[in-house]
C-alpha cells in the first residue's frame, strides 16, 4: 500500500476534499482514506458546495463524483480548477461512459477512477494528482483513446502544435500520451526528473492546457501517437 503521508517527499499528508451526494459512501470513503494517512479536510454533497469549500479550504485534491443533483461534477470540476489552479481534481464515479470521461478530462480533471477501483488504485490516483501526475482507470483508458482519435484535429492544427513545441518537448509529449510517468520519461530520454517536469510545464503553457491528461488528448488528436 502506498504511504500517503510520505508521498510528497517529507511534506505534510495530502489534503483532500470529498464530494459525493451519498452520505454513507462519503463516510466510508473518509474512513478508508484516513486509515491510509490522507488528511480529509472537508466533505461536500453537491457541486456548488464543492466549489465554495475549495475556495475556503484550498485542498490539494478534490475527489469528485459526477452524477449529483444541481451542479454536475463536470461543471464543478471546471469551476474548481478555474478558482483554485493549484487544486487537482480526481473524478471517482460509477460512470464509464466515454462522453463523461472526456468531458471531465477537458473540464480539468487530472484523474478518472471508477468506484469499483481497488484501494491501492484509488490511493495511487489521489497521490499522483497531488504531485502533478495523472491516473485514469485502466478499464476505461482504451475507450477514451478511441473517442479522442475519433475527434482528431485537422492536419493544419496538428502542424501548429508541432511548431509550438521543441523536439524534446514533442518527445516528452509522446511519452506522456503513451502512459509514462515522470521517472519513466526521464529514464527513456536520459534526463533528470526535474528536467522532465520543466518540459511538461512548458508544454502545458504553450498548449494552454491544465494537466498531463489533456496533454495526452492533444497528442492523440494531433496524430503524435
Residue ranges and their predicted role:
Residues 23-42:
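Two-component/phosphorelay signaling modules centered on CheY-like receiver
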Residues 179-214:
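Recognition helix of helix-turn-helix DNA-binding domains
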Residues 57-63:
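Active-site beta3 strand of CheY-like receiver
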Residues 68:
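Receiver (REC) domain active-site loop signature in two-component systems and cognate sites
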Residues 65, 93:
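Active-site residues of response regulator receiver
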Residues 46-49, 72-75:
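Acidic catalytic/metal-coordinating carboxylates
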Residues 146-175:
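Regulatory hinge/linker segments at domain boundaries
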Amino acid at each position: 500500500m502506498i504511504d500517503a503521508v510520505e508521498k510528497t517527499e517529507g511534506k505534510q499528508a495530502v489534503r483532500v476534499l470529498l464530494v459525493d451526494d451519498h452520505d454513507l459512501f462519503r463516510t466510508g470513503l473518509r474512513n478508508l482514506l484516513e486509515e491510509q494517512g490522507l488528511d480529509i479536510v472537508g466533505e461536500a454533497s453537491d457541486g456548488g458546495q464543492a466549489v465554495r469549500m475549495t475556495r475556503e479550504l484550498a485542498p490539494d485534491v478534490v475527489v469528485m463524483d459526477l452524477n449529483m443533483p444541481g451542479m454536475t461534477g463536470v461543471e464543478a470540476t471546471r469551476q474548481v480548477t478555474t478558482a483554485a489552479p493549484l487544486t487537482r481534481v480526481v473524478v471517482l464515479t460509477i460512470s464509464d461512459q466515454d462522453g463523461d470521461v472526456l468531458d471531465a478530462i477537458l473540464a480539468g480533471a487530472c484523474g478518472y477512477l471508477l468506484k469499483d477501483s481497488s484501494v491501492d488504485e484509488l490511493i495511487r490516483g489521489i497521490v499522483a494528482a497531488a504531485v502533478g501526475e495523472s491516473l485514469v482507470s485502466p478499464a476505461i483508458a482504451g475507450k477514451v483513446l478511441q473517442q479522442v482519435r475519433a475527434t482528431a484535429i485537422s492536419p493544419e492544427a496538428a502542424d501548429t502544435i508541432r511548431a509550438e513545441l521543441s523536439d524534446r518537448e514533442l518527445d516528452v509529449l509522446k511519452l506522456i500520451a503513451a502512459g509514462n510517468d515522470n521517472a519513466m520519461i526521464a529514464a527513456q530520454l536520459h534526463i533528470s526528473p526535474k528536467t522532465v517536469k520543466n518540459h511538461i510545464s512548458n508544454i502545458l503553457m504553450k498548449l494552454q492546457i491544465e494537466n498531463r491528461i489533456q496533454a495526452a488528448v492533444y497528442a492523440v488528436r494531433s496524430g503524435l501517437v
